C-alpha cells in the first residue's frame, strides 16, 4: 500500500494539484490468515474481498479491522469473523429489544423525553457509562486509536446487554404504563441514539439501519442520514 496506492495518491496529487491529498496517513501491519500464515492463492488460504463481504458482512469486517492494533498483524478469517458477528448481533438485539417493546406499548420518545429526577439508579448508571464512553471515544479517535475505542465499546456493550437490559426487563414487561416504565424506555432510547452515532464511522451500515428505524421514524426533523449527524457530546 505504501509503495503503490498511497505513493500514487501522493505523487499524482502533488503533480496535478500541488498539494498532498491527505494530512495524516494511518497504515497497519500485515493481514494474514487466521493461523498467522501469509495468504496465497496457491495455498488455498486467500480470501477475496467480494467473498468476505458476502459471507462475513462488511460491518463485521470493519469491526475486525477497527479492533486490531495497527502495530500488529491482523489474523483474518471466517473463524475470527464469527466471534465478531456475535458481538454485532448483541448490538442489534439491544436495538430489537427496545424497538419491539416500544412498538407494543406505543412509546413515543419525542413526547416522553428523559425526566432526570425520575431515573432509577440503573438508568443513571448506564447513562453515565454512555457519556464516559463518548468522552473516551473522542480522545481515542483524535489519536487514531480506533482499537482502544472498540475495546471499550465491546466492554460497554456487554454491560448494556447483560447488566442494564437483563436487570431491567420487568420494567419494560409490566402492564402498567407508569413513569418508571417511561423512564426505562427514555433511557434506552437516549443510550441507543448516542451509541449508534458514536459507532457509525466503524459500522456505517448497521448504524444507518438502526438510525432510520429508531430515530427517523420518531423524529421527522432528524438529519436524513446518521452520517449527517454530529458526533455525540459527552
What residues fall within each predicted segment?
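Metal-dependent nuclease catalytic cores in nucleic-acid-processing enzymes
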Residues: 2-18
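Acidic/polar loop patches that form or flank catalytic/metal-binding clefts of enzymes
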Residues: 5, 18-25, 61, 72-77, ...
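Short alpha-helical scaffolding segments that buttress acidic/His motifs in well-ordered protein cores
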Residues: 9, 25, 60-68, 92-95, ...
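Residue-level signal for inorganic ion chemistry
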Residues: 28-29, 91, 160, 204
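Catalytic adenosine-cofactor/nucleotide-binding cores of aminoacyl-tRNA synthetases and other
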Residues: 30-116, 216-222
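Membrane-interfacial loop-to-helix junctions in multi-pass inner-membrane proteins
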Residues: 78-84, 145, 180-188
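Acidic, turn-prone loop/beta-hairpin segments
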Residues: 105-135, 166-234
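Short helix-adjacent coil turns
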Residues: 137, 141-148
Amino acid at each position: 500500500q505504501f509503495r503503490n496506492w498511497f505513493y500514487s495518491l501522493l505523487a499524482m496529487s502533488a503533480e496535478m494539484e500541488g498539494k498532498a491529498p491527505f494530512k495524516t496517513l494511518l497504515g497497519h501491519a500485515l493481514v494474514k490468515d487466521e493461523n498467522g500464515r501469509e495468504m496465497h492463492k496457491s495455498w488455498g488460504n486467500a480470501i477475496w474481498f467480494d467473498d468476505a463481504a458476502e459471507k462475513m458482512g462488511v460491518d463485521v469486517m470493519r469491526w475486525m479491522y477497527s479492533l486490531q492494533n495497527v502495530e500488529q498483524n491482523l489474523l483474518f478469517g471466517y473463524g475470527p469473523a464469527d466471534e465478531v458477528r456475535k458481538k454485532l448481533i448483541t448490538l442489534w438485539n439491544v436495538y430489537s429489544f427496545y424497538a419491539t417493546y416500544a412498538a407494543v406499548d406505543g412509546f413515543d420518545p419525542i413526547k416522553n423525553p428523559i425526566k432526570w429526577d425520575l431515573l432509577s439508579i440503573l438508568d443513571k448508571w448506564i447513562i453515565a457509562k454512555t457519556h464516559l464512553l463518548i468522552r473516551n471515544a473522542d480522545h481515542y479517535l483524535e489519536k487514531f486509536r480506533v482499537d482502544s475505542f472498540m475495546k471499550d465499546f465491546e466492554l460497554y456493550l456487554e454491560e448494556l446487554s447483560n447488566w442494564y437490559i437483563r436487570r431491567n426487563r420487568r420494567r419494560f414487561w409490566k402492564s402498567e404504563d407508569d413513569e418508571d416504565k417511561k423512564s426505562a424506555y427514555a433511557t434506552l432510547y437516549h443510550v441507543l441514539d448516542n451509541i449508534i452515532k458514536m459507532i457509525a464511522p466503524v459500522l456505517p451500515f448497521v448504524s444507518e439501519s438502526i438510525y432510520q428505524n429508531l430515530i427517523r421514524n420518531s423524529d421527522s426533523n432528524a438529519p436524513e442520514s446518521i452520517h449527517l449527524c454530529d458526533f455525540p457530546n459527552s
